[in-house]
């Protein structure tokens, strides 16, 4: 119970951010006009920024056709083919309305008498032997161990976006069928996969290492806090005071944005005592 209470308290840290009036690129603006550099990026969903114009235009065009409902769509196949370009060994694709539906499907597939299947996060620690399911995050080096199930964190900046599960091996064919989801949202997911290649042209090690320091252990663009769990809320609040938002969940990951100035990250170095 104490552990659950601590997790709840950490998730509530985001409530300490003043009301957000707008979000643009990699910044949040509160109702007073103060700007915050966002290193949380909605857990990775906002890796393209909070307002990727091309992606949002495609979604808007689908909405204008009335395709906001949960309908069958050829976009399911397009999404599977796009994912096949980045995860060729995990060709069994399921699309679920939300993470709760995905985890329920995963639990049903793994067996009713098995404990809940946790999703390992390679941004926090390398995937070890025996891991059944893990998140897949862009811009991380290949993992030595490939679990049977991967859940891609796709950069579609919407909390209501569907989530995708990719499996490999004959047993993964027994995964529960996909949910019907809005073709408009599927359009956003397809576009987000293709956008990763374009982002790679301007987002890499030279940029990521600019935030290196004693506060973090970095894997690619992902930052794992080095402090103890009991110290994390204090770190979150101190950075919030100087205009930086990090992941409200310990130990992260926080994420290096694709656009920032040297001045914006000076508080990170000052806080680390550099």
Question: In which residue ranges do the predicted regions lie?
Answer:
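Conserved C-terminal alpha-helix-loop-beta "cap" of PLP-dependent enzymes
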Residues: 34, 127-130, 134, 140-144, ...
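Active-site C-terminal subdomain of aminotransferase-like
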Residues: 136-230
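Short loop-beta-helix segment that forms the pyridoxal 5′-phosphate
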Residues: 84-121
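Active-site nucleophile and cofactor-binding loops and adjacent substrate-binding regions
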Residues: 70-77, 93-100, 153-155
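Short, acidic, Ser/Thr-enriched surface-loop or helix-capping motifs
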Residues: 30-31
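Conserved PLP phosphate-binding loop immediately N-terminal to the Schiff-base lysine helix
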Residues: 103, 118-153
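Active-site-adjacent loop/helix segments that line or gate small-molecule/cofactor pockets in enzymes
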Residues: 1-27, 47, 76, 82, ...
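Glycine-rich phosphate-binding segment of PLP-dependent enzymes
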Residues: 36-37, 41-74, 81-93
């Amino acid at each position: 119970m104490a552990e659950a209470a601590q997790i709840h308290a950490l998730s509530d840290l985001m409530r300490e951010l003043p009301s957000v009036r707008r979000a643009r690129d990699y910044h949040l603006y509160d109702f007073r006009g103060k700007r915050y550099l966002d290193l949380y990026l909605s857990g990775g969903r906002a890796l393209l920024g909070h307002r990727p114009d091309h992606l949002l235009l495609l979604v808007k065009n689908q909405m204008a056709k009335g395709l906001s409902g949960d309908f069958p769509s050829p976009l399911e196949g397009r999404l599977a083919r796009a994912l096949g370009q980045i995860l060729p060994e995990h060709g069994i694709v399921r699309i679920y309305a939300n993470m709760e539906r995905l985890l329920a499907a995963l639990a049903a597939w793994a067996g009713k008498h098995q404990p809940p299947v946790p999703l390992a996060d390679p941004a926090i620690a390398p995937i070890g032997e025996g891991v059944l399911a893990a998140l897949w995050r862009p811009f991380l080096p290949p993992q030595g161990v490939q679990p049977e199930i991967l859940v891609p964190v796709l950069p579609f900046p919407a909390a209501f976006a569907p989530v995708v599960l990719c499996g490999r091996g004959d047993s993964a064919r027994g995964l529960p069928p996909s949910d019907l989801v809005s073709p408009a949202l599927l359009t956003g997911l397809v576009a987000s996969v293709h956008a990763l290649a374009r982002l790679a042209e301007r987002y890499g090690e030279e940029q990521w290492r600019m935030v290196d320091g004693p506060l973090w252990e970095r894997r690619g663009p992902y930052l794992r806090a080095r402090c103890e769990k009991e110290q994390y809320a204090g770190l979150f609040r101190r950075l919030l005071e100087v205009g930086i938002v990090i992941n409200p969940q310990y130990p992260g990951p926080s994420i290096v944005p694709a656009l920032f100035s040297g001045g914006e990250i000076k508080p990170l170095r000052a806080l680390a005592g550099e």
